Structures are given as C-alpha cells and as structure tokens.
C-alpha cells in the first residue's frame, strides 16, 4: 500500500536523499565516502533486491560483485526502466538505493543494440539518469512535506552539474540541447519552494546556457501561480505567449513543447481570468495559443468550458469552440443572450418561464450564485432577498424543485464565503420562518449535484470554523440515523477540525467511519504495475498529516498507529480482492475486521455529545499533566460549539416532526 501522508520520524525526503544518494556524479558537494564505508545495509547479500535488478541489466559475460560494481557492462534501458517502475510505484527508498549503487561503480553503459555509450566523460552517469532523477524529485515535491527547500537546492545542484557534463560531453559543441522536460522539472522544483532567491538562481543558469527568454518567462509565471500573485501573473502572461511568427522551425517546435509542458500554469492563469470576468483578455490568450498550434487536453478543456459556463463567460466558450474540433453545448435555458448585469430575480424568472426542471435536467447554472456576492454581510438583508426571490417563484411556478435549486445555490455560496454562524442562521430562517424544509431536502436530488447538496455544504461550512467539532459530530449522527449517503469530503471536513492531541478520540472516530463507508472506493487497479492497490486520497492524507504534525504529545505512537491501520486495511483489500461477481463492484471491509484493526479498547466506535465531552476532558487532563498549552486551545470556543450542535439537532428534530405530520 502506498501512503500519501508522511511519517513524522527520520524518513523526511531531504534526509532520505542525503542518506541514499551519496553519489558524487549527481551531488558532488556531498563528497565520496571511503571505500570501507558500507553504503547500503544489504550490500553484503548477493541476493539483495538491487543485485537482482542489476543482474537483469548485465550482459552475459559479466558477473556482479556483491560489494561493488567494477568494470561491468550494464544495459542503460533496463536500469532506467527499473527506476521508472520504482518511481511510479512510489518507492523512493529503493529508488535511491539503486541509483546510489550504480553511481558508485565503474560501469560501461550499453544502448539497446549493445553498443557502448561514450558521449559523456568516463565514470559519469549518462544524462538520461539526470532526466529520470528530475522526474522523481518533482514527484516527491508534490507531497505535503517540509522538504521543498531541500529539493530546490538539490535541483539547482543537479542542473548545474548537468550543464557541466554537457560542456564536457563528446557531443559536438552547439548541437547539444538540454532536455526541456528535465528543465521544466527543475524549474517546478524551484518554484514549489516559493523562494525568489532560488528562482533567480535558476534563471541565471538558464541565461548562462542560452536557454532563451521564453523559459525564463514561463518559470516566472509558474512562480506567480504557485505563490498566488495573481496581478503579477496577469502582467507576465502575454510575454509567455509571444508572436509565433518570430521563430525558425526548430525554435518554434521547442517553444511549442515548452508551452505544452507548462500548460498547467497556463490553464490556472486562464481560470483566474475567467473567475475575474476578464473575458476579452482570456480570449486573446486563447487565440495567441492557437497560433502556436497549442491544444488543451480534454480534461483541461472541459474544466475551462464548465468554469466559463459557471461565470457566464460565453465569449470564452465560443473562442474555444472555434479553436477545437469539438463543440461545447452552451445553451443556458435562455440565459446565453442576457447581459452580465442581469439580476438573480430576472434569471429565476427566465428559468421559470422556460420550465427548467433541476431534478430532471442537467445544467451549468452555478454562475448565478455570483450574483449573491454584492449582498452585504447583514442577516436581515439576506432574509429580505430570500423572501423576494421566493415570492417570485411562488407566483410564477410554485415548483419545489426550482426552490430547491435556489436554496442549494444559496447554501453552496454561503459555505465558502460566509462564516458558519451566518450560514446556520439562514438555514434556520429557511426552515423555521419560510417553511422551506421540503425544498431543502430535495437538494440532494438535483441532477449532477449528489456530492454538493445542502447537507454536504453544511459539513464544508462547519469545517471552516475551528469551534465545530461537536457540531460536526451532531450533524453526522443526525444524518447517520436516516441512512444518509456520506462522501469522503464529509469525513474530510471532520478530520480538518482536529487540531491537537485533545482531539484524538474524535479523530479516530472520524477516521474509522471514513473507512467503514468509503474505504472500498480507494481500492484501485494500477495499470502500470498490473496490480491492485489501496491508498487514501491525497486530501485525506494531507489532513491526517496536518493533525499528526500538530500533536503535542505521543506523536510517534499516533503516527505508528495510523500507519498500522492504513497498512492493515490496504493489505486486507489487496489480499481479499472483495469483488461482487454479479456487478464487479467492491465489497467494503467487514466491520468486525475493521474494529479489530483499530483496536476495541483504543477506539470509540460510538460517540455522542456526552462521550465527546468526557473524552476531550480526559485528553485535556493528559495535556495538563504534561504542562502543555497550545494556540489551538485558545482558539477553540467550547460554548460556541455546544450552541451550534444544539441548533443543528433542533433543526433535524423540527424537520422530522414536520415529516410525521404529513404522514
């Protein structure tokens, strides 16, 4: 099983590389260890896994020495393929162990046809290994680890050494061009450090080696995107898509490749422009990219089109349709011809007139929620606005489904833009005063909205406030009683509010219920390795990592416990492969088996308000015994949490009573 959250011990990325990758050819500043130094713990064993891989790469006449590689012929493509598989299977320890082994020997490298590769100084690794290593370092940088500065330093040293070997290579001077994917990887490693100092350093290396202004501009764009400097990003964007007629054929081809490699930054820039209603500017960038024969992949294209529909940027959709062989469906139930300043009430009027049915028709009308942004942070103003829109809907259609659509749009907007108290107050107004509890329940049936309906919005809104642990517990218990279909995002919201050791029992309660209901969705088939694997989603792994890193006591104990749980659950799925034969669906792990994995005496499998308060008091006492106090303790408001939780319980009690009255 591949873990997506880091282990808080001595296995940080920077230390892993320093311990394993002590190869002067790659990192000359670390120096070569004495010959008596045993680099690998298993290098005395002739049957170690690295020995096996190297034997696969040997020519028939060579033999592998158990301690060192001396004067052997290895096939480059076989070793590279092994490294690529280790990278893809997320095994950095063995990856660097193998790279270290080949870097400390005297090897003659052979190409696929068996001829020696001699276009680089003797006893130096071929440049292909630099390209491959940059891919691995970039993959490591995607983790939520505290090693991004270390990776940035490594990438600078790697690039500097790469250019040095380039000048010393036997390739004819002037014809050698650096691998642009390697340059992109090094750039993004630097960018992820968010250090302007390292950015300037890599740009100087590019300038000294005549890599061209476009690469420097794209690296600057990537830096602005990573650091969310949107104004600066917009200023430099046009220079990243220059006049396509100014280049020769080779330079043009290289520029197109660079643009494609940096396409995530370009896509993010376009998304910012669309969100800011910079429609004309976005269209100009799209037209400039088309002159370079640049094409977005289907995923990015779909996301840009949907975002444009959400923000009613119809010119962008038309431009993308003109540049693409496929055409997006842009009809918005009569809204496509409306000016952007049309009010929400006018939009609802058109939807009602066109008999829009959100429970049957899929739509891209989320952009209407942006028309709520102008309302001030005043509860009475919002209540008045809700009344006006609802009165209009009652007069024109009185359809519960259209009112459900309006409520869902309203709460999705509130969950990300207002505090939880404000959001909960409006929900209470909708249920108690407006008597719209039926449309509220219907939001779960809106087409294409299964994972973003009202109650999921409540989970997300509550997770934005640190004083909502008991509130989220109450919300979960109330919905669990009626058999509600939770998503992994609901449990992510519960994990996010865990901020310190006092939250331990609540954390394991949420983690357990996540695995009860969602773990079968994390069991996937890896096409590359041709095997099944089980892994936690990245966001879940990040939330777990954040909680583990915030613990004041028992850090190692909890880290080991979480790792053991995920290991055991993953092993259960991989070993049992619990498929239902009739449909090919995956059977969730047995609850009794999962409880055994968590530990019956260690975990609270049932938790209500009283149990929560007792468990928190117990953990608080353990903290006081250690004389520990954190900023998170001061931020958490228990009284507010109790109040929110009671209001949530009252809401559900009221809705249940209304349902009983109608039976």
UniProtKB/Swiss-Prot annotation:
Gene expressing this chain: MNE1
GO cellular component terms attached to this protein's record: cytoplasm; mitochondrial matrix; mitochondrion; ribonucleoprotein complex
Other known facts: Present with 861 molecules/cell in log phase SD medium.
UniProt cross-references to InterPro entries, sorted A to Z: MNE1
Domain of life: Eukaryota
Originating organism: Saccharomyces cerevisiae (strain ATCC 204508 / S288c)
Biological process per Gene Ontology, one example term: Group I intron splicing
The name this protein goes by in its record: Protein MNE1
């Amino acid at each position: 099983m591949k873990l997506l959250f880091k282990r808080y011990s001595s296995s940080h990325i920077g230390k892993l590389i320093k311990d394993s990758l002590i190869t002067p050819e790659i990192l000359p500043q670390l120096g070569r260890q004495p010959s008596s130094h045993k680099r690998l713990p298993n290098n005395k064993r002739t049957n170690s896994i690295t020995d096996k891989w190297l034997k696969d790469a040997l020519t028939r006449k060579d033999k592998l020495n158990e301690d060192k590689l001396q004067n052997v012929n290895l096939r480059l493509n076989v070793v590279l393929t092994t490294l690529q598989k280790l990278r893809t299977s997320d095994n950095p320890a063995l990856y660097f162990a193998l790279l270290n082994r080949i870097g400390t020997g005297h090897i003659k490298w052979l190409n696929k046809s068996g001829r020696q590769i001699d276009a680089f100084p003797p006893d130096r690794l071929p440049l292909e290994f630099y390209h491959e290593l940059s891919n691995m370092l970039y993959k490591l940088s995607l983790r939520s680890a505290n090693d991004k500065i270390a990776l940035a330093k490594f990438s600078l040293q790697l690039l500097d050494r790469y250019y040095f070997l380039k000048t010393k290579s036997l390739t004819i001077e002037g014809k050698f061009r650096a691998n642009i994917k390697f340059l992109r990887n090094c750039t993004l490693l630097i960018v992820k450090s968010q250090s302007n100092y390292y950015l300037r350093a890599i740009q100087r290396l590019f300038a000294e080696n005549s890599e061209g202004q476009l690469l420097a501009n794209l690296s600057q764009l990537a830096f602005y995107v990573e650091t969310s400097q949107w104004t600066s990003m917009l200023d430099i964007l046009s220079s990243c898509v220059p006049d396509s007629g100014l280049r020769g054929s080779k330079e043009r081809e290289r520029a197109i490749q660079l643009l494609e490699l940096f396409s995530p930054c370009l896509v993010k820039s376009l998304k910012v422009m669309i969100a800011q209603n910079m429609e004309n500017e976005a269209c100009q960038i799209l037209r400039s990219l088309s002159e370079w024969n640049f094409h977005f992949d289907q995923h990015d294209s779909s996301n840009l089109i949907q975002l444009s529909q959400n923000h009613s940027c119809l010119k962008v959709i038309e431009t993308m349709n003109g540049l693409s062989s496929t055409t997006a469906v842009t009809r918005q139930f009569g809204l496509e011809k409306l000016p952007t300043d049309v009010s929400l009430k006018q939009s609802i009027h058109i939807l009602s007139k066109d008999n829009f049915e959100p429970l049957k028709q899929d739509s891209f009308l989320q952009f209407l929620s942006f028309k709520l942004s102008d309302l001030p942070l005043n509860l009475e103003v919002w209540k008045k606005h809700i009344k006006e829109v609802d009165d209009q809907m009652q007069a024109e259609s009185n359809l519960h489904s259209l009112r459900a659509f309006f409520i869902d749009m309203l709460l999705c907007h509130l969950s990300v833009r207002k505090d939880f108290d404000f959001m909960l107050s409006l929900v209470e107004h909708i249920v108690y005063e407006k008597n719209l509890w039926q449309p509220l329940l219907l939001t779960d049936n809106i087409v294409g909205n299964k994972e973003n309906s009202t109650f999921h919005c409540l989970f997300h809104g509550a997770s934005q406030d640190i004083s909502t642990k008991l509130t989220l517990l109450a919300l979960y218990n109330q919905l669990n009683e009626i058999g509600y279909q939770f998503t992994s995002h609901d449990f992510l919201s519960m994990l996010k509010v865990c901020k310190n050791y006092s939250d331990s029992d609540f954390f394991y309660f949420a983690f357990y219920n996540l695995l009860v209901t969602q773990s079968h969705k994390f069991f996937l088939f890896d096409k590359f390795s041709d095997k099944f694997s089980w892994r936690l989603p990245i966001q879940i792994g990040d939330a777990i990592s954040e909680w583990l890193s915030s613990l004041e006591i028992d850090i190692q104990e909890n880290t080991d416990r979480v790792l053991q749980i995920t290991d055991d659950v993953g092993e259960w799925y991989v070993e049992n492969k619990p498929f239902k034969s009739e449909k090919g669906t995956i059977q969730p792990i047995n609850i009794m088996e999962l409880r055994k994995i968590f530990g019956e005496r260690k975990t609270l499998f049932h938790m209500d308000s009283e149990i929560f308060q007792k468990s928190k008091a117990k953990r608080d006492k353990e903290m006081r015994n250690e004389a520990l106090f954190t900023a998170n303790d001061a931020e958490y408001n228990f009284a507010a949490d109790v109040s929110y939780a009671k209001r949530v319980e009252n809401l559900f009690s009221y809705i249940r009573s209304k349902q009983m009255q109608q039976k």
